[in-house]
Amino acid sequence: MPHFRPFLGLGLANYEEHQVCAVAIGVVGDICRALEGNVLPYCDEIVGLLLRNLQNPALNRNVKPPILSCFGDIALAVGGNFEKYMQVTMSMLVQASSTAIDTGNADLVEYLNQLREGIFEAYTGVLQGLRADDKSGAFEPYVMGALDLIRQVAEGIPSGTTSDEVLRAAAGVVGDLGSSLGARGLKAVARQSPHREYLKALLKEAKASSNEQTKQVGVWAHGTLFAPP
């Protein structure tokens, strides 16, 4: 990794050739899965480059979803050590969640689905990484940000523009939130209006999906929040 690091950094910084940048982002994910916690010494540089790209208005928009997903790969690899990057990462996820599009434009609808899937993959990696090191409580300040995107997805279901991949990813985050923070009051939040309504609507749609994997995730997530104690 020390010998490869400079080339990886050059690839991540090469926003002008977005395909090169996208490949470098994919390599980061592979490195995280291979090295796991041993990737930690390189995370300051990697996270810094990823954040810089997200803030760059010249970056090709198609690179943003894999960047967001990459934060989940990093968090899953380093576990509780991701806590130092939480504030800035969560801020970026919330900012990306506010992206609005013309739903009559098929290309933009596809992009929004990819963006949301990347955001949910980031949330999943962070939640699972923290839980592995018994640091789930570090996510508590950011629960409402995640729930707001889940609400947006649930409210968009009737329009028919939400992909099954996004539905499954959203349901997965609901399940991860319930598994990680249920004892700290998320179940109580989920039973309150308006959270109860959109969470149940989303999970009902997931459980009714023709995709077996989405259906299973929906059933599991529903159980983490609404199963009797």
Give the residues covered by each predicted segment:
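Karyopherin-beta/Importin-beta family HEAT-repeat alpha-solenoid scaffold
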Residues: 1-229
